[in-house]
Swiss-Prot record:
Protein's name in the database: Chalcone synthase C
CDD domains noted in UniProt: CHS_like
Swiss-Prot/TrEMBL GO biological process terms: flavonoid biosynthetic process; polyketide biosynthetic process
Source organism per UniProt: Ipomoea purpurea (Common morning glory)
Keyword set includes Plastid: no
Pathway per the UniProt entry: Secondary metabolite biosynthesis; flavonoid biosynthesis
Catalysed reactions, as listed in the record: (E)-4-coumaroyl-CoA + 3 malonyl-CoA + 3 H(+) = 2',4,4',6'-tetrahydroxychalcone + 3 CO2 + 4 CoA
Ranges annotated as spanning the membrane: none
Zinc in keyword set: no
Enzyme class: transferase
Amino acid sequence: MSTAVTILTDTWTRREKRFDGHAKILAIGTAIPANWVDQTTYPDFYFRITNSEHLLEYKEKFRRICNKSKIRKRHLVITEELLKKNPNLCTYNDASLNTRQDILVSEVPKLGKEAAMKAIKEWGRPISEITHLVFCTSSGVDMPGADFQLAKLLGLSSSVNRLMMYQQGCNAGAVMLRLAKDLAENNKGGRVLVVCSEVMLSVFRGPSLQQEDNLLAQCLFGDGSAAVIVGTEPRPGLETPLFELVSAAQTTIPDTDSYLKLQLREMGLTFHCSKAVPSLITQNIEDCLVKAFEPFGISDWNSIFWILHPGGNAILDGVEEKLGLEPEKLRASRDVLSQYGNLTSACVLFKP
């Protein structure tokens, strides 16, 4: 497992002379599908649409998982009509990768476009000034990729520099900020459009008595996209910086590659999450923070603004308790989880 830490600020300075060329976030945009599900009634819908209502005890177990998730609702591309047209999506083991791909290759960039357009509108500059596009998704794989499709949808210049990142999982939101920081700071005058777009159709399937991890995936993930525009030296009166990207770091915890896995199979993207993941994060979070913040002389974890990926309520509770955080420190992360579920890469860029 990898932990990515990105330090954003509009007030902090280093001990040494401040570097004026730090990248800034100039705009943020988000988007969600219009269709949404109520978490309290979702177990009834899920077991009915997957023809699994005979699994009464398993359904009640799923209901308990949903009730404990602290998720109120999730927005989904999935509708009853879509699932009835594609029944192979509703069983656990049916070969359905082609069906999923056919839907995702259009839905992922389309949802990404909505977030990107909102970010561009907030930025207030011509779209022709975008020099780089970085796109990320764990929903589907295609070539030409979702970055190419999004560039066409937006009408970006044919000379825009594109980078496509597939299958980076929940870690990707912070990683994308790190990449955007590097691109902006090494390309004077560049403006980097970052887009994360996720559609949980890739992991949707019926229940399996042998794979309880699947129930967690069906309870947890939602659909959404987020976009930010990053650049250096904002032009006074023309651009308004929201955050400064001061530093970015990534730490991989040794011998943890089996704890959290998503694997692309004929049946789609399968999900495995060890029950030890929340405690693993809790045990290692402070060491990661010390390495990231020590150069800035910061050791009081309540003195900083938090954007923690809401991978699940147990993770948020564990980090809060381990670090002695005041309740409001993780309020934004809890609000995103409650209103949208786990949006994978888009979560840390989302506004509750």
